[in-house]
Curated annotation (Swiss-Prot):
Identification of the protein by name: Solute carrier family 26 member 6
UniProt record similarity statement: Belongs to the SLC26A/SulP transporter (TC 2.A.53) family.
Expression induction: Down-regulated by pro-inflammatory cytokine IFN gamma.
Record field: transmembrane: 116-136, 187-207, 264-284, 294-314, 348-368, 380-400, 417-437, 485-505
Underlying gene: SLC26A6
Lineage: Eukaryota, Metazoa, Chordata, Craniata, Vertebrata
One GO BP annotation of this record: cellular response to type II interferon
Membrane topology: Multi-pass membrane protein
Length: 759
């Protein structure tokens, strides 16, 4: 009984669901309205141009309220900090800030090495920019600071402008490091200027040109670049400096060539550190629900490796390279070297765009997850100020880290108070504890970097998913990845963006063209090739393109239209013109002979003359022109015969029609262009539409348009598209309106057709 009772409600529910589905299918709606062309629609809806909003007037207003609003807009901390719920959020932000700081310390040291700078400058870059973002940022969860992709981009610039000496024994490390710090800090200032400038002019949409496949392909290639750049620290090798295209290939070849020179102590140190880091990360993933915060594997590895290196003397006994001197305290601000701007402007713009793209993509992910809004333009300003002010204090360009951002969110972080706490912890290390890491092996920092690349290297699996989902996106991913690997990071991004934009143009050149048919008993029209029940309306051809028509695809649109209609329009027009020309020539010849006949009839002799008027009878028969009769003309009755012949010609049907000329006629009398996909029209599109009207009217097919949006109609008017031959009565509110009108008004053969000039 219990089982039966339990199954009863389920059966009842299933029956109700089926009944509701049937009711929904049977539920239809009936609506009666007149056919609406554009003229009637404008009258009915009282259409008028939308009023222009003068946003610039608002921007240029000068008032106390406007100044206060601008202050709150560009300094968001004044908005959210007074409302900060201390009891609910402070504990989570404190724990999150400490967790992020524990990650910031080893990553800052390691990523400075990746940028070709002394490790302490990674700590500076983990303090100043983070605190500046706390004041100006709008994302509550991203962790700003050093990041592998940004660091390797900076490293490629510093190594190209301040390279190693050709003879390693002649290296002046102090002078080299000072030059690289100057290059990196100047680069950071220039990156900040670009980002602030773009943010102030509301240019945050620039990141929309970097699609997700492009960004993921780029970061994956950058991860490969980072991995290769750390091999010299893992194996303890001294490599030559390579920059420019194919530098990655040259570096890999040199590593393979010098692999026998590897230092065993360095390799063992890196391997042990890597194994420890991997094990700790696996434990964190497995015990994520049980642990209040992740095990700080990087910090523990850092402390343990430093202690072992100091106790065992790894530098002297096994020639393991160590970090060396880390000065305590902060450095004074330094003005950027403006003479380097011309050399850095290209790299600075690339780094600015990439850094912003990474930050805004992560920021939007967390904002969507937690239900708040991120202002892309203010994010540009915040990142720009972080890099600008950070560069003055000798930091290198930063962005946000995915791994640290995830930790900041997962450990209870609710606001950028967590970022401020982490920056204060880094400040404590800079001032008091930095010198304790003097004996930290560089191989350990390299291991930390390589292990943290796991997430980005996993993006190689994108190729499989993109192959199944969208092969055009896969092509973007592959081109971006390959170009970045071969041409380096700056040129790789340029090639990727250009290719992505070209692919967009190519895809608009080859949209999906379809002939539409009516779904039975509805006013819905679908592609007859996809919907088996959709049938073409007899006598009417409905054509649609899935993309807007503009200069790049207007010719393709016209060609596809003529092909899908099943009529060789150009051939019919050319044959019609040839036959009409021949007909005119025959008529002219006949008139000339009649004139000659009249002259002979008016001669004084008055003799009866037998004349064959039509000497080209066979020619006229072969061209389907009405046969001319052989006639006997005398001087007495010639004018009466000519009058009779003229009356017969006036009653004859129009000889210019396809039927009269013996040419095949289209099996439809009306063509409807579904223009619902058009978002704009240019002059080339206007000319193409005009030519379509002209060509199809030449073969006795009337053309109508349907489903144009109001902005498109306005652009048609501005382009003087409508005239005496093409009016708004040819434009209908929907495809069904146009089809119904075409069926009610099949185009008759006109006595004097309205001509449309072909453009």
């Amino acid at each position: 009984m219990g089982l039966a009772d339990a199954s009863g409600p389920r059966d009842t529910q299933a029956l109700l669901s089926a009944t509701q589905a049937m009711d929904l299918r049977r539920r239809d709606y009936h609506m009666e309205r007149p056919l609406l062309n554009q003229e009637h629609l404008e009258e009915l809806g009282r259409w008028g141009s939308a009023p222009r909003t003068h946003q610039w007037r608002t921007w240029l207003q000068c008032s106390r309220a406007r100044a206060y609003a601008l202050l709150l807009q560009h300094l968001p901390v004044l908005v959210w900090l007074p409302r900060y719920p201390v009891r609910d959020w402070l504990l989570g932000d404190l724990l999150s800030g400490l967790s992020v700081a524990i990650m910031q310390l080893p990553q800052g040291l390691a990523y400075a090495l990746l940028a070709g700078l002394p490790p302490v400058f990674g700590l500076y870059s983990s303090f100043y920019p983070v605190f500046i973002y706390f004041l100006f940022g709008t994302s509550r969860h991203i962790s700003v600071g050093t990041f592998a992709v940004m660091s390797v981009m900076v490293g490629s610039v510093t190594e190209s402008l301040a390279p190693q000496a050709l003879n390693d024994s002649m290296i002046n490390e102090t002078a080299r490091d000072a030059a690289r710090v100057q290059v990196a800090s100047t680069l950071s200032v220039l990156v900040g200027l670009f980002q602030v400038g773009l943010g102030l002019i509301h240019f945050g949409f620039v990141v929309t040109y970097l699609s997700e496949p492009l960004v993921r392909g780029y970061t994956t290639a950058a991860a490969v670049q980072v991995f290769v750049s750390q091999l010299k620290y893992v194996f303890g090798l001294h490599l030559s400096s390579h920059s420019g295209p194919l530098s990655l290939i040259y570096t890999v070849l040199e590593v393979c060539w010098k692999l026998p020179q590897s230092k065993v102590g360095t390799v063992v140190t890196a391997a042990v550190a890597g194994v420890v880091l991997v094990v700790v990360k696996l434990l964190n993933d497995k015990l994520q629900q049980q642990l209040p915060m992740p095990i700080p594997g990087e910090l523990l590895t850092l402390i343990g490796a430093t202690g072992i290196s100091y106790g065992m003397g790894l530098k002297h006994r096994f020639e393991v390279d160590v970090v060396g001197n880390i000065p305590a305290g902060l450095v004074p601000p330094v003005a950027p070297n403006t003479q380097l701007f011309s050399k850095l402007v290209g790299s600075a713009f690339t780094i600015a765009v990439v850094g912003f793209a990474i930050a805004i993509s992560l920021g939007k992910i967390f904002a969507l997850r937690h239900g708040y809004r991120v202002d892309s333009n203010q994010e540009l300003v915040a990142l720009g100020l972080s890099n600008l002010i950070g560069g003055i204090f000798q930091c290198f360009p930063v962005s946000c880290s995915m791994s640290r951002s995830l930790v900041q969110e997962s450990t209870g972080g609710n606001s950028q108070v967590a970022g401020a706490i982490s920056s204060l912890f880094i400040l404590l290390i800079i001032v008091k504890l930095g010198e304790l890491f003097h004996d930290l092996p560089k191989a350990v920092l390299a291991a930390i970097i390589i292990v943290n690349l796991k997430g980005m290297l996993r993006q190689l699996s994108d190729m499989r998913s993109l192959w199944k989902a969208n092969r055009a996106d896969l092509l973007i991913w592959l081109v971006t990845f390959t170009a970045t690997i071969l041409l380096n990071l700056d040129l790789g991004l340029v090639v990727a963006v250009i290719f992505s934009l070209l692919l967009v143009v190519v895809r608009t050149q080859m949209p999906h063209y379809s002939v539409l048919g009516q779904v039975p008993d509805t006013d819905i029209y679908r592609d007859v090739a996809e919907y088996s029940e959709a049938k073409e309306v007899r006598g009417v051809k409905v054509f649609r393109s899935s993309a807007t028509v503009y200069f790049a695809n207007a010719e393709f649109y016209s060609d596809a239209l003529k092909q899908r209609c099943g009529v060789d329009v150009d051939f019919l027009i050319s044959q019609k013109k040839k036959l009409l020309k021949k007909q005119e020539q025959l008529k002219l010849k006949q008139l000339q002979k009649e004139e000659k006949l009249r002259k002979q009839a008016a001669s004084p002799k008055g003799a009866s003359v037998s004349i064959n008027v039509n000497t080209s009878l066979e020619d006229m028969r072969s061209n389907n022109v009405e046969d001319c009769k052989m006639m006997q003309v005398s001087s007495g009755d010639k004018m009466e015969d000519a009058t009779a012949n003229g009356q017969e010609d006036s009653k004859a049907p129009d000889g210019s029609t396809l039927k009269a000329l013996g040419l095949p006629q289209p099996d439809f009398h009306s063509l409807i262009l579904d223009l619902g996909a058009l978002s704009f029209v240019d002059t080339v599109c206007l000319k193409s539409l005009k030519n379509i009207f002209h060509d199809f009217r030449e073969i006795e097919v009337e053309v109508y348009m349907a489903a144009c949006h109001s902005p498109v109609v306005s652009q048609l008017e501005a382009g003087h598209f409508f005239d005496a031959s093409i009016t708004k009565k040819h434009l209908f509110a929907s495809v069904h309106d146009a089809v119904t009108f075409a069926l009610q008004h099949p185009r008759p053969v006109p006595d004097s057709p309205v001509s449309v000039t072909r453009l």
